[in-house]
Every structure is written in structure tokens, then in C-alpha cells.
């Protein structure tokens, strides 16, 4: 299909949930986020302009939906299936702070009785107290931050997180979110190529700092090399026959192969 660079994302139909056995999905409670009831996933934007070297969504065009369109889909899910919990799976929901606050305002304006969360993570460099407060007031219960590492060297030289990323600011964001009554999680990646034992110890130490300021949960994931990313080196990583199932974090590759000399 020819790529339409002038596509208005608001013209794209809502996901065809009506073609799925929605009650089965709702009752299974197999969500990416923390499900407490009748839930569904949602995407308010696609893409991420940042260049994290391990990420499948790096440097992709960011396209967003309007606050009105997002609220329309929420309202539709309420009316059709009585869904009251929404898990936003955007690659980077906080690129446009003004738009995110507009979504929060639209949810409040329509008096939509919902809860929502960001299990895919939001970028701390775009967060401030005004945004977190707007999220909380519109029903957000849980935010996930993605520091990836507690080592400045890893963030700058290996992950290439971006010059605007600051670990101290992320810690402050976690403290502010906790103060406002939000549940907070933080994601880290271990085992990156070139990562040392000292780097990993710094990450663990930083995770403890987050816990002290009120972050409720920290998650450590293993690095998995993905095709078309800068860290994809099949020969170096001893990948002979590529099977996409092996590239999932739940696959055998994650258990059998280490991508740094510091971890067995």
C-alpha cells in the first residue's frame, strides 16, 4: 500500500472490537497493565521520534489523534461493552503535552466515569506536575516511567536516550506522581551490549532511590536484540536461524543467551 503522509488519524475507524469475542478478552484479565475490571487497550498516538537503540519504535513518525476522537472511542466502549478501564499503549503518549492535557480535559468535560493507565511507559522529560495532576483528575490511576538504566554512561553511549533525559528529573516525577496519589512503576533493561557490572549496580541503586521517593514497583527486563535496530548483530549474538518467537521476552533466547560479558 502506498504510504499516505497526509493521513488524518481521526479519519481512521476505531478498532473493530465488535469482530472479537470481547467478553472473553475482558474476563480473561490478561492485560499489559494492571486490570481491576472491564478493560480494553487503546492507542491515542503512534510512533516515537527518539532514538533508543534497542527499541522497535525508534525514530518513527509520531502521529496523534485529537482529544475529541480519543474521547469518542472511550464513550463508544462504555456504551457498547460497559468498559470502564483503559490501558493506553502509545509508544510515546507525552510527546505533545498540550494534547495530553486536552484529552484529560475532554474526559472530565464529558464526565466519563473511567480509570486509565499508561503501561507502555511515558517519557519523563516531558512530564511536569500540571500534566500529572490533569491525568489524575481525569481518572488516571497508574503511570509507568521508563528510565531503562540508572547508569548515565549506558543511557548516553549505549541506549542513546537523548540529551533531554535526566535521571534526577525522572526521580522527581516519580515523587510527584506518588504525592498526587498515582501508582507508579519503572522499567529497566539489563544485559545491554557493553553494559558492565558497575553499570548494573548503578541501575539497582537507582531503582532503590525510586522506591524511597514512592515508586511502587520496578521491573527489570532482559535486553533482546531486534532486527533493524542499531543493536541487532546476529553473528555476534550467535543468532543463526531467526524465529520471531525467539525475539520475544518470553522466548527461549531471553533465557539462553547473554549479550554482555558481565552476565552469564
Q: Predicted regions span which residues?
A:
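Short catalytic/ligand-binding loop motif for oxyanion handling, primarily in non-cytosolic enzymes
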Residues: 1, 8-9, 51, 63, ...
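Short, basic, helix/turn surface patches
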Residues: 1-7, 91, 169-181, 208-220
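Short aromatic-enriched loop/helix-cap "lid" or pocket-rim segments at secondary-structure transitions
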Residues: 2, 12, 100, 130-131, ...
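C-terminal accessory regions of radical SAM enzymes
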Residues: 4-5, 26-30, 198-264
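Radical SAM [4Fe-4S] cluster-binding motif and immediate context
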Residues: 14-187, 205
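Short, well-ordered beta-strand elements within core beta-sheets of diverse protein domains
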Residues: 43, 191-192, 258-261
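Short, solvent-exposed turn/loop segments enriched in Gly/Ser/Thr/Pro and often Arg
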Residues: 89-96, 120-121, 190-194, 220-231
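Active-site glycine- and acidic-residue-rich loops that bind
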Residues: 124-126, 194-200
Amino acid at each position: 500500500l502506498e504510504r499516505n503522509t497526509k493521513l488524518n488519524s481521526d479519519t481512521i475507524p476505531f478498532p473493530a472490537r465488535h469482530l472479537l469475542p470481547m467478553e472473553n478478552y475482558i474476563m480473561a484479565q490478561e492485560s499489559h497493565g494492571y486490570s481491576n475490571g472491564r478493560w480494553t487497550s487503546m492507542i491515542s498516538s503512534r510512533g516515537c521520534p527518539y532514538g533508543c537503540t534497542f527499541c522497535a519504535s525508534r525514530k518513527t513518525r509520531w502521529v496523534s489523534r485529537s482529544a475529541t476522537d480519543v474521547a469518542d472511542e472511550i464513550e463508544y466502549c462504555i456504551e457498547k461493552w460497559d468498559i470502564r478501564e483503559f490501558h493506553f499503549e502509545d509508544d510515546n503518549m507525552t510527546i505533545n503535552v498540550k494534547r495530553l492535557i486536552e484529552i484529560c480535559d475532554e474526559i472530565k468535560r464529558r464526565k466519563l466515569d473511567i480509570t486509565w493507565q499508561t503501561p507502555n511507559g511515558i517519557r519523563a522529560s516531558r512530564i511536569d506536575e500540571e500534566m500529572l495532576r490533569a491525568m489524575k483528575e481525569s481518572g488516571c490511576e497508574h503511570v509507568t516511567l521508563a528510565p531503562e538504566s540508572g547508569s548515565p554512561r549506558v543511557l548516553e553511549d549505549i541506549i542513546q536516550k537523548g540529551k533531554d533525559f535526566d535521571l534526577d528529573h525522572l526521580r522527581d516525577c516519580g515523587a510527584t506522581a506518588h504525592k498526587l496519589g498515582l501508582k507508579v512503576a519503572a522499567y529497566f533493561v539489563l544485559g545491554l551490549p557493553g553494559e558492565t557490572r558497575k553499570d548494573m549496580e548503578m541501575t539497582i541503586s537507582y531503582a532503590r532511590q525510586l522506591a524511597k521517593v514512592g515508586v511502587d514497583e520496578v521491573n527489570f527486563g532482559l535486553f533482546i536484540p531486534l532486527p533493524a535496530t542499531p543493536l541487532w548483530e546476529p553473528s555476534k549474538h550467535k543468532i543463526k536461524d531467526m524465529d520471531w518467537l525467539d525475539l520475544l521476552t518470553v522466548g527461549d533466547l531471553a533465557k539462553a543467551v547473554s549479550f554482555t560479558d558481565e552476565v552469564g
